[in-house]
Amino acid sequence: MKKILSAIIALALCASVAVGASGCGCEKNKKTAKNTTSTSSGPGYKVEPTNPDFEEGQFGFYRLNDNEVKVTVYNGNEKNIEIPATANGSKVTVVGANLFQASDIESVKIPEGVTEIQKHAFSSCQNLKEVNFPDGLKVIGENAFWNCKKLEKIELPSTLKKIEWYAFSATGVKSISIPLSDTLSTLPEKVFFQCSNLSEVTLPLSITNIADDTFAECADNLTIKAYTGSYGVSYAKNHNIKLEEMPRS
C-alpha cells in the first residue's frame, strides 16, 4: 500500500512540474524560423540577418518567392561594393537587415529592382562615403544608415513610400532634398537626429507630417527651405528652425 501511495505522489509531482514548465513561457526561447530577425530597433542594436538559401559569388541570398530574392550575407572583403541585380535567375529586390553593419565598406551600388533596404543594413559603416539609391526604391528601414559618419551626400529617389525612424541619424550629411513624391508624406522620429553637419533641408509640398525630433541635434545653422503656405513653413516656424520660403510656381 505504501508503494502504491508513493507512486501516486510521484506522478502528481511530475504533472505539476510539467504544467509549470508549459506555462512559464519557456517555449518562447526556442529558435524561430530562419527568416525571422531581431525586433530590437534602437540605434546600434544588432539585428541578426536572415540565413541564406543559397550563395552566389560573395553573397548569400534568401528566396522570397519564385522570382525574387533578398541578399542577406556578404562574405567578401571589398571596400567598393556592387550588389548584383540577379542571383540564380531571380531578381534581387531586398537588401537584408544587418547586411553590412559595422563593416569598412566605402561605397555601394544598389541595383535597379531593389525596392527595400531593411533595418541596420549599413549602420555604423564608418567609412561609407557613397551610396546610390535606385529608382524604384520604396522603403528605407529603421537605422539603415545610422552612424555612417562619412556619408555626406544623399540623393533619394521620388519612388520612396516610407523612410523609417533613425534611418539617416548621426550621418555626415550636409544637405538633403526630400523628393517630391505622391507616396511619401511623412518624416518620422529622428530620421536625421544628431546629423551635426546638416545645415540645409529642402521640403516638397508632398510632405505633410514631420515628427518633432526629426531634426533634433542637427547643425545650429540648420535652414529649412519650403514652399510658401506649405506644411514645411509652419513646421520650421513652430520648431524655431531658420526658414527660407520658396515661391510656388
Where do the PLM segments sit?
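Consensus positions within tandem repeat domains that build extended binding/scaffold surfaces
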Residues: 96-99, 118-123, 141-146, 164-169, ...
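Short beta-strand/loop segment at the start of cytosolic alpha/beta domains
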Residues: 42-74
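Acidic, glycine/polar-enriched metal-coordinating patches/loops
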Residues: 215-218, 239
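Structural signature of tandem-repeat unit edges
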Residues: 58-59, 64-67, 76-93, 103-116, ...
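Sec-dependent N-terminal signal peptides of Gram-positive bacterial secreted proteins and lipoproteins
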Residues: 3-26
